[in-house]
């Protein structure tokens, strides 16, 4: 009828079913046509007018929706759907408190409260009012013990409130009523995992996968928990089950690779890291894991190749640049190492080790003034560090500013005398200088 424009008579219930069907499957143009035909045949139907309003709201025609809703409210001021649609409209306008007021009014007008509790929960979530959101979702779960969407939302609220023990208490009560619910066992396991109670988490995940042997999420969390407990081979076995039950994921391949690495099986680790980047070539972390394993094997050429892959995907991670520089140092590519450490600093990685590494490379290539500038920057965030003061002393000495060199050497010795050996490693000419030796000797005697 709707596609041919032939007109037939339908009773009101049939029209409502047709319209709701089209709305549910996303064919709103056909739903609108059905509403139009329905109102032509049943012009006084409030339910059809409410469906018309719902379609207006969906299309963001809020002014028209409000106008139509006002007309309906005059006819049926105590219709709960009027207040639900009012709530939907003002919610779209960002007026979530007003939406809540309308939904609370709707609650007083109907015995079918579950959908309204769900809508209330969502409105409270918009306001980050997790406690009230949780209470409404709990109402949904109490009304329908198999409302798993609301169950997830309850746990989400507990998570956002960081009330993990309270979540466990709630889930235990839920499990008492519905003991064969794999979703609840999975969620209680997650709460135990957050609290680092891994043995209890493992038991919960075991129940989840016993109840549903095809529950991928249960096996995945079980594998992660076994990994946390150091049971790497068992973790691998469970990750492999997830690959059998569902499509392969780069995440699972990476986790298997890490487990093999923990077991000392580098060859297997490399195999699975390569599977991970094959599955997801844009997984920068996968390329980094390959980098690290080849770095540990002292295969710096391959490590350099893989870190370049990681950086081509994500060049905003200081960790990648730090590894890049460490590799370049091993290959004696000093200018590239300098570039990498400078990138770390520009990305906000102001760890003292980054500053020191950059200073040492600049010193090695004879860029003493540049090294001094970096030390000055380092000192702003790292005061009274022997690592910095001894390098100040050495650099000032090399730049023929012995007065400053002596000041920093004395300061360095007061912080950590034994660390003066760094002068021998980095500034041998300064270390063996007669004046330096006398300062070191005199300080030691004075402090004995």
What is the meaning of each model-derived region?
Residues 24, 58, 92-93, 126, ...:
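Register position in tetratricopeptide repeats
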Residues 41, 74-76, 109-110, 143-144, ...:
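Structural marker of alpha-solenoid helical repeat scaffolds
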């Amino acid at each position: 009828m709707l596609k041919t424009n032939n007109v037939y008579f339908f009773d009101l219930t049939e029209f409502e079913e047709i319209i709701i069907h089209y709305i549910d499957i996303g064919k709103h143009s056909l739903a609108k046509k059905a509403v139009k035909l329905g109102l032509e045949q049943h012009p006084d139907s409030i339910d059809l007018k409410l469906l018309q309003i719902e379609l207006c709201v969906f299309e963001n025609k809020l002014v028209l929706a409000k106008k139509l809703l006002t007309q309906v409210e005059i006819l049926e001021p105590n219709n709960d759907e009027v207040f639900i649609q009012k709530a939907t409209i003002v919610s779209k306008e960002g007026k979530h408190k007003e939406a809540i007021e309308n939904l609370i009014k709707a609650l007083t007008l109907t015995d079918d409260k579950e959908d309204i509790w769900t809508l209330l929960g969502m409105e409270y979530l918009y306001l980050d009012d997790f406690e009230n959101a949780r209470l409404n979702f709990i109402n949904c779960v109490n009304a329908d013990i198999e409302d798993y969407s609301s169950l997830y939302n309850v746990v989400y609220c507990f998570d956002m409130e960081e009330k993990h023990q309270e979540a466990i208490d709630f889930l235990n009560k839920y499990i008492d009523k519905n003991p064969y619910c794999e979703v609840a066992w999975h969620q209680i396991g997650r709460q135990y995992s957050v609290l680092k109670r891994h043995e209890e988490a493992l038991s919960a995940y075991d129940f989840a996968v016993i109840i549903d042997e095809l529950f991928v999420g249960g096996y995945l969390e079980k594998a992660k928990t076994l990994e946390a407990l150091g049971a790497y081979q068992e973790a691998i076995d469970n990750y492999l089950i997830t690959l059998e039950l569902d499509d392969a994921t780069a995440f699972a391949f990476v986790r298997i690779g890490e487990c093999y690495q923990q077991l000392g099986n580098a060859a297997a680790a490399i195999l699975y890291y390569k599977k991970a980047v094959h599955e997801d070539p844009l997984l920068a972390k996968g390329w980094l894991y390959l980098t690290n394993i080849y770095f540990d094997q002292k295969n710096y050429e391959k490590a350099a190749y893989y870190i370049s892959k990681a950086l081509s995907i994500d060049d905003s991670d200081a960790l990648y640049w730090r590894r890049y520089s460490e590799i370049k140092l091993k290959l004696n590519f000093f200018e590239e190492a300098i570039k990498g450490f400078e990138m770390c600093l520009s990305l906000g990685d102001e760890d003292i080790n980054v500053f020191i590494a950059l200073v040492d490379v600049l010193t090695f290539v004879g860029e003493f003034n540049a090294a001094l500038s970096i030390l000055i920057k380092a000192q702003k965030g790292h005061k009274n560090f022997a690592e910095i003061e001894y390098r100040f002393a050495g650099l000032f000495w090399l730049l023929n500013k012995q007065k400053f060199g002596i000041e920093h050497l004395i300061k360095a010795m007061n912080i950590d005398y034994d660390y003066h050996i760094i002068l021998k490693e980095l500034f041998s000419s300064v270390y063996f200088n007669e004046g330096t030796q006398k300062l070191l000797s005199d300080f030691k005697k004075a402090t004995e």
